[in-house]
Amino acid sequence: MHGGKDNYTYLTTAPIRRVIPTMAVPTIVGMLVTSLYVIADTFFVGQLDTQSTAAVGVVFPLMFFMQAFGFFFGHGSGNYISRELGARRHGNARRMAADGFFLSLFTGLTLMTLGLVFLHPLALLLGSTPTILPLTESYLSVSLLGMPFLMSSLTLNNQLRLQGNAAYAMVGIVTGAVLNVALDPFFIFLLDLKVQGAALATVIGQVVSFLLLFRMSHHEGNIGIYWRDFAPSWPAVKEIFYGGSPSMSRQGLLCVSTMLLNHAAGTWGDAAIAGMSIVGRITMLVMAVVIGLGQGFQPLCGFCYGAKLYSRLKRAWWFTTIVGTVFLLVVSGLGWLFSSELIALFRDDMEVVAVGVVALRWQLLTLPLCATMMSSNMLTQTCRKPWRANLLAASRNGLFFIPSILVLPCWLGLTGVEVCQSVSDLLAFIVTVPVMVYTFRELRA
């Protein structure tokens, strides 16, 4: 970790092969442990029955919805902060930190209230079937209570990370996630709260993360959050939109696509929903490493863009992309060999495993392409190329996935549901390549 005064020199001059791992490792750890919020719920609830597993899977899109807003405010304010620190304009960075945090907190409180008021229609919208509706509502009602804490935690996390203080960001998120995993068996089995206990453990972890991150934002070398700095203006909101809308597109469309996936899989019963939701969690865990690597690249990208060090920025992008691709190739090979065991680890049900194995193997075929897509999206987002960043963010889970999930099951049945993500990944990669060629031509040293 480097103090605020040292971050500029470190991010703009130190060797790339040292800077990115230094920034990425805490972020990867944070991303992996954050994934345990939902992985742990799936694992422990999976010990109950298939219906409980499906109910938790149905609420899964809500996590993406909350992340969409948290990343919108976090990346929107954080990317601006990193550019302003790179340009040595610290006052602007301080005001943006307060604007991003408080707007995120107030938005979370508003959405939580709306969700609780419209609980029943929300459960149906998420894709619940009549057989699991009571379980879905039970899990959902508690999960909504954590919305303002998760959203504002993600905002703080990304602000700290994009200042170059990834270790602080990691500690706050990891502590809450570890607490969640520890509390899951206590609430689910010992107190016999079942799916509601899983949600309660998650909310407690989110509250703890929020408190720690807020406290750490006031440590020396970080930009503290103060009410006196909160003065949102149209230029500030516009900067948040430019920097955060790609994250909103990416996570928001992931929410929509997962709901459509639940509805499509529901045609073949609760086992199909459970199988597809388990595959979603496995790939989410793998992608957490690649996203963490990309987020380790972002502070360097933002500082170098602000300092006009474009050649260094491009070299860092290539380093990030190559490392991410190699990692995904290795993981995809191992996942293909042990696909049955991976699915059965979460729910040892023959129907669930049958659906999950086929879907997982299809996704693993195109997973290595995701490293290029992710690093490209983060570069265009951090370098204030909002329309290109939004196009890349929307491609994988929206532009191509949504038509695929609406059309392919009609032609191929359940197989159409299982292959949708692979088709979308391939088409999104084809779009990414020319966008990056054009962007690199603009970034001339």
Where are these regions (language model features)?
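Short alpha-helical transmembrane segments in multi-pass integral membrane proteins
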Residues: 1-24, 81-148, 190-245, 301-366, ...
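N-terminal transmembrane alpha-helices
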Residues: 11-43, 47-48, 64-76, 80, ...
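Transmembrane helical elements of multi-pass membrane transporters/channels
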Residues: 22-41, 142, 153, 176, ...
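Helix-terminus/linker motif at the lipid-water interface of multi-pass membrane proteins
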Residues: 32, 36-54, 123-130, 186-193, ...
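Residue-level hotspots within pore-lining transmembrane alpha-helices
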Residues: 33, 37, 66, 70, ...
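Small-residue-rich hydrophobic transmembrane alpha-helices
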Residues: 53-113, 150-169, 275-339, 370-389
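Hydrophobic transmembrane alpha-helices of multi-pass small-molecule transporters
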Residues: 65-68, 112, 180-185, 209-214, ...
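Short runs within selected transmembrane alpha-helices of multi-pass transporters and secretion channels
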Residues: 74, 143-161, 169-177, 198-211, ...
